[in-house]
Amino acid sequence: LLSGRGGASLAGLAMLRYLTERTSASDKPPVATAGDPALAVLTQDTLKAGYEAANAEDLYQPTTGRLSGPTPFSFVAGAMPVVRDENVSANVLMGDFGPEIALVTEAAERSDVPTLGGTDDLPAQAVLYAAAQEPLIGEELFAAGAYLGAGPSHTASLTVQDILRWLLILFLL
């Protein structure tokens, strides 16, 4: 979370908040796993905020946000049983993953669970492109909030990025 790749994790938290608000009262509420202790705490807080925004505070269970493992492979080993055993309806993978994420997508495929995935790691993007039903390629990971209409700040950030790109292009010319 505190590394240079923490932005992908923060984008994943924004997606988690959006999904929690919309699915908190369903028969299959969200379950979130994290591969970093600080991110696991933020995951629990994001889940709680999503339940509060949906006026479903009484349905929130702190155990639905968890640390599945602090290293890449221990994270995958802890996330695979969640997909397989906890009766999830969709598998959303957003954050800083390596190619080992293929093991989670395989577990989802075996459980007939659709996968949406996005990461900032190029080899993992290639894996998700091949294995996920809905891969997010490149900066789509960071634009996912705007795609879903999660708020005006997401749309504004994309507009600012586009303006800065055009200014950089004009400067280079």
Predicted segments, located by residue:
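Long, charge-dense
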Residues: 22-24, 28-76
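Gly/Ser/Thr-rich loops at beta-strand to alpha-helix junctions
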Residues: 2-10, 36-40, 94-101, 122
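Elongated extramembrane "stalk/tether" segments
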Residues: 9-10, 14, 53, 72, ...
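Well-ordered alpha-helical segments embedded in enzymatic catalytic cores
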Residues: 15-18, 75-78, 143
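Long, charge-patterned amphipathic alpha-helical coiled-coil/hairpin "stalk" segments used as oligomerization
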Residues: 68-133
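Short, glycine/charged-enriched secondary-structure capping and boundary segments
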Residues: 11-13, 45-48, 105-109
